């Protein structure tokens, strides 16, 4: 596993990459003042995550979920059972979520708080019916809604490429300097600024909804390889 750390005024963001069968990225937010931690989309190895947090002298109090897919939540119940952590999920995602523990729901523009650290909720459905992102100081944790030079598929229950198109319009409004952190390391870089995504991610470069849906559902998978590289407008227009 690869690990990266980003330190801000009120929190430290640590990310474990290439975790488990689908090589997920697991995000830890450590609030400096309260010595509490939130973990985002914990899957595959509950004990490893709990031990990591404990070894740093922090208490795990929160589990933040971006979307319901099993590769992002299969350690949630075990962690909640062992720590009593509160589970947060988007209000429109609960009908797909299969967890034993109760959840707290959030909606667009809500704020979740961890000690002195605050994250703004951005509803970004499309990959799932109720997917959300967490916008912190300088960082966007996007789950699988947006990847480095890519975006989530629309192939499972609740997914809709037309809805995803409108979520992309929200991503375009996020400040250029914000760093993007994704649920999987599929891109040519682990993270980039949103400015880089706006100029090189095809899903943020298509302005017409019909073209976007056609590209997402019928063109993208056959025209790109991993790790995903930035795309020029000229190359994208040729595909459309």
Where do the model's predicted regions map?
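Well-ordered beta-strand scaffold positions
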Residues: 11, 92, 110, 117, ...
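Active-site HxH/HxHxD metal-binding segment of metal-dependent hydrolases
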Residues: 21-23, 34-37, 44-120, 199-210, ...
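Core dinuclear metal-dependent hydrolase active-site scaffold
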Residues: 27-28, 109-135, 173
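Conserved beta-strand hairpin/beta-sheet module of binuclear metal-dependent hydrolase folds
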Residues: 2-56, 133-143, 149
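Accessory terminal helices/loops
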Residues: 1-5, 166-240
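Hydrophobic residues in well-ordered beta-strands that form the structural core
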Residues: 87-91, 142-143, 182
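Histidine-centered catalytic micro-motifs
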Residues: 63-73, 123-129, 180-187
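Divalent metal-coordination and catalytic microenvironments
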Residues: 29, 41, 67, 79, ...
């Amino acid at each position: 596993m690869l690990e990266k750390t980003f330190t801000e005024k009120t929190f430290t963001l640590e990310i474990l990459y290439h975790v488990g069968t689908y090589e997920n990225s697991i995000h830890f937010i450590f609030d400096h003042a309260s010595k509490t931690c939130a973990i985002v989309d914990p899957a595959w190895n509950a004990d490893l995550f709990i031990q990591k947090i404990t070894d740093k002298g922090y208490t795990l109090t929160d589990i933040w979920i971006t979307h319901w897919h099993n590769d992002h939540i299969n350690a949630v119940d075990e962690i909640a059972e062992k720590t009593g952590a509160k589970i947060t999920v988007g209000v429109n995602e609960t009908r797909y979520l299969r967890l034993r523990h109760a959840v707290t729901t959030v909606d667009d523009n809500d704020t979740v708080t961890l000690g002195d650290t605050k994250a703004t909720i951005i509803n970004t459905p499309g990959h799932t019916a109720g997917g959300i992102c967490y916008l912190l100081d300088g960082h966007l944790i996007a789950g699988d809604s947006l990847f480095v030079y890519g975006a989530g598929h629309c192939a499972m229950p609740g997914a809709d490429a037309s809805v995803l198109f409108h979520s992309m319009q929200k991503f375009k409004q996020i400040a250029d300097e914000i760093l993007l952190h994704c649920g999987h390391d599929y891109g040519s870089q682990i993270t980039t600024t949103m400015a880089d995504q706006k100029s090189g991610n095809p899903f943020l470069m298509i302005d017409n909804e019909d073209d976007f849906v056609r590209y997402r559902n019928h063109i993208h998978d056959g025209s790109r390889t991993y790790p995903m590289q930035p795309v020029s407008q000229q190359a994208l227009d040729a595909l459309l």
